[in-house]
């Protein structure tokens, strides 16, 4: 006999899990771990949105270079961020970042946009979203 009623568990399986990662830390290791975990979850099928704020928003600047690579794989957070972007994540800088920095929108890495507060608020409220902050 076929099942006629879809359960909540069935619905969760068919909908991609939404993850909103907010990175604000200036710490190289914290930025690196945020990128490593975000990329790992993205590889597991999570639909990823990343918001870069405060000093972490520097990662979104095309010319930015971290002071050093992180062991054990010799990666820099901005390199991992580029992998995340290339894999289809939505990445944005905080709406307050550019107006309060010396950068313009054209300085952003390709694939990074300026966050729209109303849209971000909607994503944060979504019952299907998990929010992580670093």
Can you say where each PLM-predicted feature lies in the sequence?
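Positively charged, low-complexity intrinsically disordered leader regions
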Residues: 2-11
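Short, glycine-rich nucleotide/cofactor-binding loops
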Residues: 14, 19-32
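Solvent-exposed loop/turn segments at secondary-structure junctions
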Residues: 26-28, 55-58, 97-101
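A short aromatic-anchored loop/beta-hairpin motif
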Residues: 84-87, 92, 99-109, 113-122, ...
């Amino acid at each position: 006999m076929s099942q006629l009623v879809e359960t909540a568990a069935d619905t969760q399986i068919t909908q991609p899990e939404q993850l909103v990662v907010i990175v604000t830390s200036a710490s190289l290791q914290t930025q690196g771990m945020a990128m490593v975990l975000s990329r790992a979850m993205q590889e597991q099928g999570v639909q990823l949105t990343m918001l870069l704020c405060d000093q972490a928003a520097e990662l979104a600047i095309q010319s930015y270079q971290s002071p050093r690579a992180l062991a054990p794989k010799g990666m820099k957070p901005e390199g991992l961020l580029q992998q995340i972007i290339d894999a289809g994540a939505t990445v944005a800088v905080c709406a307050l970042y550019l107006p309060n920095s010396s950068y313009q929108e054209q300085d952003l890495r390709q694939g990074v946009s300026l966050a729209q507060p109303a849209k971000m608020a909607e994503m944060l409220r979504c019952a299907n979203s998990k929010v992580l902050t670093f």
